[in-house]
Every structure is written in structure tokens, then in C-alpha cells.
Amino acid sequence: MLAKKQKMQETDTEQEATPHTIQARLVSDTGEEAGPPIDLPAGITTQQLGLICNALLKNEEATPYLFFVGEDEIKKSLEDTLDLASVDTENVIDIVYQPQAVFKVRPVTRCTSSMPGHAEAVVSLNFSPDGAHLASGSGDTTVRLWDLNTETPHFTCTGHKQWVLCVSWAPDGKRLASGCKAGSIIIWDPETGQQKGRPLSGHKKHINCLAWEPYHRDPECRKLASASGDGDCRIWDVKLGQCLMNIAGHTNAVTAVRWGGAGLIYTSSKDRTVKMWRAADGILCRTFSGHAHWVNNIALSTDYVLRTGPFHPVKDRSKSHLSLSTEELQESALKRYQAVCPDEVESLVSCSDDNTLYLWRNNQNKCVERMTGHQNVVNDVKYSPDVKLIASASFDKSVRLWRASDGQYMATFRGHVQAVYTVAWSADSRLIVSGSKDSTLKVWSVQTKKLAQELPGHADEVFGVDWAPDGSRVASGGKDKVIKLWAY
């Protein structure tokens, strides 16, 4: 009995010996130290850590941060996250801080308008870089440009002879390109709704995807890359209306194309590969192999920053950029690109009919991670604007969330009752919207890993979804021929 009592006293003193202060260092996710090691109380909260971090970094405006110890996020306080008994008081603990978006995008909760007009299914949707305009492509062979203030069509653009499969805004917002099932590409003037020059013809099959050269590489936005079912990727000068280059190398349909910020073009194909080309001369730089079936789509880590060019659509709402010269705008676009991709090493992720995704870096042939877990075809994949996360949409009715740095699985969002066709991110990287065959849109919260909002309203399958780059609204369209706008 005495021995037992002694033992209890010992454990009591052990508990008392648990450290009440912990030596810690605040380190950025790229490894830079915010300051020297400091003694922190074990009960310190994330709010208090935020104040210390902002003070150490001498931030003029308070930035919200996430904090991690190893893989574990500090949700409430340090002692909740750490196993205090096993903490070595001699050693300094690294607390990694990650800046979050300063602004918050509110979850869209209601349909603000239903815009009929198309006579066939709406196949593609794309907001302009500043979020002020919306373009849609439809099975009725037309492209429509919508005025988002009055929520009516500005222009109905006629010229294609077949289904319009993709629409893409130039990064300066002054041109719109559309590609159709017949293989022709038309450039439109969004101010007038008129064609600019002759259609760009040369492809022998349908156009699957279009990508413009980034603004910081050419503020004139003259060059456009197209991916076609004929197995080729072509580069066009839209001002001259000429094909500058035909990049042949895939042995089956090219499903997607991305124009990176470092002078490289990435293509995915039904030949099961992703290829990387030099934009200047069309030379093949790398072939990324690994998928066992068609590659349906690719996403680039720099997609959001390249889409929005010189300005951040939320932070730069003041429209001060209207007075800037082209050189200043180009400089601003380059700065934004370099902030996301300082060493020009872009990451890309490919999704396939083999139910997997692969994460690649443009400076190595071997994949960083084979991302498995989906039980069916993976149709769409997108990087979050802050490049921390990846979302994928699958025919297995789920959306999955992955860590962008190493492709590790994070969460599964279940709720759709049929195939998920497409996903889009909010500008603050906190929300994902998905569109499905089950006729609904769903908004998911990254923080809670749960459904944030159910958006029923379409009468049939949802093919296209886009979240405005300024976070203000979501647009969706599909088989019921109606475009719906959703807002808070």
C-alpha cells in the first residue's frame, strides 16, 4: 500500500514538472525565421501567436496566420496540439506560420438571377480577369457576353458552326477566345461583341482548351495556345490571325493546355502523357509518363496569378491601376508571379481516367506523388489561389482535397449523388464550389472539411462552374440552358 502511495506522489510531481513555458521559434513555411527563439507559455492561443508573429515581422497591416507544429495545425492553443509530457525542454520547437488571405470571401448562399438565352446546353463559362464580365459558350453555337450589373446578355456572338466547347479571356480582359467542335477558334472584342479578324483555322478536330500567354511576358496579349482532338497544340498570333507554330508530339487528342509564367507550355493528352514544351520554339522539354489511361485535365500552381495578371482582383479594387502605364502593369504582373513562383519551378497536377492524379514539378521527370483514393474517373482538378491546396472532382461523386506541397491526401467531401464534373475555388482559398450531374452545386469549407452550402436550382446536369476572381459571385451553367449567378 505504501509503495502504491509513493508511486502516486511521484506521478503527481511528474505532472507538475510538465513545462509551463516552451522554447519556440516562429519559422515561415519556406524556412525563414521570424526572430530568435522565445519562451512561450504552453497555453498560448493561436490569436496570441498571431499577434507575436505580426510584431516580429513588423507587418504594417495585421495578417491572419495558420500555425503548425510538424504536420499538426494549432487549432486552439499550443498545449492542445503538443504532447506536453514528451516535450524536451532543452530543445527549441519550430512553429511554422502560413499567411492566410487578409480578405474573406463570403460563401454564396442564394441564386441572384437565372439568365436564360442559350438555345442549347451551356458547356463552358469564364469570368473576365477583373470579375466584371462573364462569357459563356453553348451547344447552340453562340458565345454570350453577360453584363453582371443588369444580369442580361450584352452580346450574342455568332460565327461558330458547331458547339462552342471552351471560352477563355486574355489576361488583359480586352479579348475573348472561343473554340468549337469544328476546330475553329474565334477572337471576340468584348466591348462590341464583334469578331476580331478572321477565325483561326488549322485544327482538324474539336478544340478542347485555350490558354493565353501570361501578361508579364507580353502585355499586348497577342499569343494564344490551343489544344485539339487532332493531337496537336497550336500557337497563334491573334493580331495577325496566323498560326505561328504547330506543336505535334502527342499520339492522341490533346485534352488541356496551360501556358506557364516561365516560357513553358504544358499539354495533357489521351495518349496518357503530359508534355512540357518551350513556348519560344515549340521544342519538347519533358514528357511526364505514369498514367494508365487518358489524362483529362491539368492544373498549374500559377493558374490564379496568371489568370488575373497585373492585379489582385480583391486587394486592388480601388481601380488605381487604370492610370498605370503598360510597363508598370507588366512590372506588377511579374512581381505577383514571382511572389508565387520565385524560382520559376512551377508545379502541375494531372487527373486521369485511371482514377488517379499525379503531382509534377517542371524541373524533374519523376512525379512528386501519385495521388490515389478516387474510386472512378477524375474529371477536373484545380489549385487553390494561395497554392497551398488542390481540389479534384470525380465520377465517384466526391471532391477530394490534397496538400499542394507534396500531394498528400487531406479530406473527402461527400454529398453529391452523381458524378462531379467540375470544381472552382474562392479567391481566399477557403471555399470550393462543385458542379455535378445531380443538378446541384455545393459549397465546401476547407476549414471544417464539411458542406457549407447546398445550391439546388438547375433542372439538369451542371457542366460549367466558375468563381469570379474577385470572389463576388459564382456562375453555373449546364444542360438546362440557363446560366445562374449565385451570391452571398
Curated annotation (Swiss-Prot):
Q: Per its UniProt entry, which superkingdom is the organism in?
A: Eukaryota
Stretches for region Ubiquitin-like (UBL) domain: 19-101
Q: Does the keyword Nucleus apply?
A: yes
The WD repeats lie at 117-156, 159-198, 202-246, 249-287, 329-370, 373-412, 415-454, 457-488
Gene3D superfamilies, per this entry?
YVTN repeat-like/Quinoprotein amine dehydrogenase
Q: Which InterPro entries match?
A: G-protein_beta_WD-40_rep, Gprotein_B, NLE, WD40/YVTN_repeat-like_dom_sf, WD40_repeat_CS, WD40_repeat_dom_sf, WD40_rpt
Map out region (Disordered) in residue numbers. 1-22
Q: Where in the cell is it found?
A: Nucleus, Nucleolus
Q: Name one GO cellular component term.
A: nucleolus
Keyword Metal-binding assigned: no
Q: What is its main location?
A: nucleus
What biological processes does GO assign it? negative regulation of Notch signaling pathway; Notch signaling pathway; positive regulation of Notch signaling pathway; regulation of Notch signaling pathway
**Which is one GO molecular function term here?**
Notch binding
Q: Which keywords appear in this protein's UniProt record, sorted alphabetically?
A: Notch signaling pathway, Nucleus, Repeat, WD repeat
Q: How does this chain assemble?
A: Interacts with Notch (via cytoplasmic domain). Associates with the pre-60S ribosomal particle.
Which PANTHER family is this protein grouped with?
A: NOTCHLESS PROTEIN HOMOLOG 1 (PTHR19848:SF0), WD40 REPEAT PROTEIN (PTHR19848)
In the UniProt entry for this protein, what further remark is given in the free-text comments?
A: The name 'Notchless' derives from the ability to suppress the wing notching caused by some Notch mutant alleles.
UniProt family annotation: Belongs to the NLE1/RSA4 family.
What's the protein here called?
A: Protein Notchless
